[in-house]
């Protein structure tokens, strides 16, 4: 191994920079091109700012969908609207009058 000039910065040492520039190709050869390519392409690690995804515009039929939701009636409480006492009495009457149950 040849001696390196001590006055030279480490990133300027011979062989520290690849002879070809980095590119956007993701083939095996380009993924192992240099340490930066290996981290970003091979491992998928990037410490830069994340690109903000653009929100897609609403589909063309969405306006009618929103209108139909607002026209729906409000939810009603579950169970018999007459009340719990009346529903129990109604069940008792039905069981008394139904001869097939016995």
Curated annotation (Swiss-Prot):
GO terms for biological process: DNA-templated transcription; positive regulation of transcription elongation by RNA polymerase II; positive regulation of viral transcription; symbiont-mediated perturbation of host chromatin organization; symbiont-mediated suppression of host innate immune response; symbiont-mediated suppression of host translation initiation; symbiont-mediated suppression of host type I interferon-mediated signaling pathway. Zn(2+) 2 binds at residues 25, 27, 30. Residues 62-77 have a biased composition (Polar residues). One of its GO terms (cellular component) is extracellular region. Keywords: Acetylation, Activator, AIDS, Apoptosis, Host cytoplasm, Host nucleus, Host-virus interaction, Inhibition of host innate immune response by virus, Inhibition of host interferon signaling pathway by virus, Interferon antiviral system evasion, Isopeptide bond, Metal-binding, Methylation, Modulation of host chromatin by virus, Modulation of host PP1 activity by virus, Phosphoprotein, RNA-binding, Secreted, Transcription, Transcription regulation, Ubl conjugation, Viral immunoevasion, Zinc. Residues 38-48 are annotated as: Core. The modification Asymmetric dimethylarginine is found at residues 52-53. Residues 22-37 are annotated as: Cysteine-rich. There is a cross-link at residue 71 (Glycyl lysine isopeptide (Lys-Gly) (interchain with G-Cter in ubiquitin)). Residues 49-86 are annotated as: Interaction with the host capping enzyme RNGTT. It is found in: Host nucleus, Host nucleolus; Host cytoplasm; Secreted. Residues 83-96 have a biased composition (Basic and acidic residues). A motif (Nuclear localization signal, RNA-binding (TAR), and protein transduction) lies at residues 49-57. Residues 48-102 are annotated as: Disordered. Pfam families: Tat. The modification N6-acetyllysine is found at residues 28, 50-51. Residues 1-48 are annotated as: Transactivation. Zn(2+) 1 binds at residues 22, 33-34, 37. HIV-1 lineages are divided in three main groups, M (for Major), O (for Outlier), and N (for New, or Non-M, Non-O). The vast majority of strains found worldwide belong to the group M. Group O seems to be endemic to and largely confined to Cameroon and neighboring countries in West Central Africa, where these viruses represent a small minority of HIV-1 strains. The group N is represented by a limited number of isolates from Cameroonian persons. The group M is further subdivided in 9 clades or subtypes (A to D, F to H, J and K). Interacts with host CCNT1. Associates with the P-TEFb complex composed at least of Tat, P-TEFb (CDK9 and CCNT1), TAR RNA, RNA Pol II. Recruits the HATs CREBBP, TAF1/TFIID, EP300, PCAF and GCN5L2. Interacts with host KAT5/Tip60; this interaction targets the latter to degradation. Interacts with the host deacetylase SIRT1. Interacts with host capping enzyme RNGTT; this interaction stimulates RNGTT. Binds to host KDR, and to the host integrins ITGAV/ITGB3 and ITGA5/ITGB1. Interacts with host KPNB1/importin beta-1 without previous binding to KPNA1/importin alpha-1. Interacts with EIF2AK2. The cell attachment site mediates the interaction with ITGAV/ITGB3 and ITGA5/ITGB1 integrins, leading to vascular cell migration and invasion. This interaction also provides endothelial cells with the adhesion signal they require to grow in response to mitogens. The Cys-rich region may bind 2 zinc ions. This region is involved in binding to KAT5. Belongs to the lentiviruses Tat family. This is Protein Tat. It comes from Human immunodeficiency virus type 1 group M subtype B (isolate RF/HAT3). The gene is tat.
